[in-house]
Regions:
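Short beta-strand segments
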Residues: 23, 61, 156-160, 235-237, ...
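N-terminal active-site beta-alpha-beta segment that forms phosphate/nucleotide-binding
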Residues: 49-214
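Solvent-exposed alpha-helices and their adjacent loops that cap or buttress functional pockets
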Residues: 2-4, 11-15, 27, 50, ...
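Acidic-glycine-rich active-site phosphate/pyrophosphate-binding loop
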Residues: 31-42, 117, 228-236
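Positively charged, low-complexity intrinsically disordered leader regions
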Residues: 1-41, 45
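Short, hydrophobic/aliphatic alpha-helical segments
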Residues: 35-51, 149, 153-155, 301-318
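Short, glycine-rich nucleotide/cofactor-binding loops
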Residues: 34-39, 162-166, 243-248
Length: 318
């Protein structure tokens, strides 16, 4: 992740493996803030509060949650508590349960005294694998999207599936970064993505760091942009993909898919294998969907004229 002129990952282990460093995504785009997580409870809280978010990153963060917990208590009871607390932190993203099961199944088979070292090895391995997968997604998308001429490529995306949703590179934005690196003129339409504004707060911030041209649009503007021929491709990430290809993603994704189909515009979902729910093949309406606090619709965070970050009410829900 390029921030200014320095590369970052969204999550990294400290050298002595006593804590992990994360980018506090709730502070963006107003402040770039690194915080340290030292305990299982802090990891669970960071996932629930969306200080870390994005399906792939949540999974890797959970793996580090095991490692931090094993530093204090590597017993079977501690291991079971880790699994239960982490898998219930946010239910929609299947990457979370995938990573939790991967780490738990490996640790439960080994002696307690070996679990600390192994848990850190597993977490770091999952983090590195995530980066490798995202680079591969970027290359695959690049080969799909690269034009035969040097015209501007206009791509619409919803929510945030860039660096901040993964350990690095991103899923849906990875092909965009690759196109830009190869010299193509790329312009991105960025949905604001209400109610938490991940597009406005995170995707636009990422693209700004990379110097990629972009325009933030209201969530309802996508249809008109497609109708007017101003969108060449739509690409999004995913929280969960069923075996038959059904996709669960941020609210509003379905509307973009329907309009893209109506206007004969290619619609792509970029996701690693860990986002595929191999145990699910029924109706997508039966996916467990996270229901968040209604106050997220009625409030919005912003910066006032004095540079203070404040939260304002947008209306009265009563």
């Amino acid at each position: 992740m390029l921030v200014g002129s320095k590369n970052y990952r969204t999550i990294e282990a400290s050298e002595d493996q006593s804590y992990v460093k994360i980018i506090d995504q709730t502070s963006l785009p107003f402040k770039f803030k690194i915080i340290h997580l030292r305990t299982l409870d802090e990891v669970v809280r960071a996932i629930k509060n969306m200080q870390v978010r994005g399906a792939p990153l949540i999974g890797v963060t959970a793996a580090y949650g095991f490692a931090l917990s094993m530093n204090f208590d590597s017993s079977d009871n501690s291991l079971s508590k880790c699994k239960n607390d982490l898998v219930n932190a946010r239910p929609t993203a299947v990457n979370l349960s995938w990573a939790v099961n991967q780490v738990y199944d490996a640790l439960i088979k080994c002696p307690s005294k070996e679990r600390v070292e192994l848990s850190w090895e597993l977490a770091i391995k999952l983090a590195n694998q995530d980066v490798e997968k995202n680079i591969s997604i970027g290359l695959h998308g690049y080969n799909l999207f690269k034009p035969s001429n040097k015209k501007t490529i206009n791509i619409l995306t919803h929510c945030n599936a860039g660096w901040l949703a993964t350990v690095d590179h991103g899923t849906a934005l990875s092909p965009i970064f690759k196109l830009f690196d190869e010299g193509f003129d790329v312009h991105v339409w960025v949905d604001e993505t209400r109610p938490r504004n991940q597009g406005l707060s995170l995707t636009a911030w990422e693209l700004s760091q990379y110097k990629i041209r972009h325009t933030v649009v209201t969530d309802n503007a996508g249809g008109l942009l497609m109708k007017e021929g101003l969108v060449d491709f739509v690409i999004v990430g995913a929280d969960r993909v069923a075996l038959d290809g059904q996709v669960c993603n941020k609210i509003g994704t379905y509307l973009k898919a329907v309009v893209a189909k109506e206007n004969n515009i290619p619609f792509y979902v970029a996701a690693p294998v860990s986002t595929i729910d191999i145990n699910f093949s029924g109706e997508i309406r039966n996916f467990e969907i996270e229901c968040r606090d209604p106050s997220e619709i009625m409030t919005m965070k912003g910066e006032d004229k004095l540079g203070n970050i404040i939260e304002v009410n947008l209306g009265n829900s009563t």
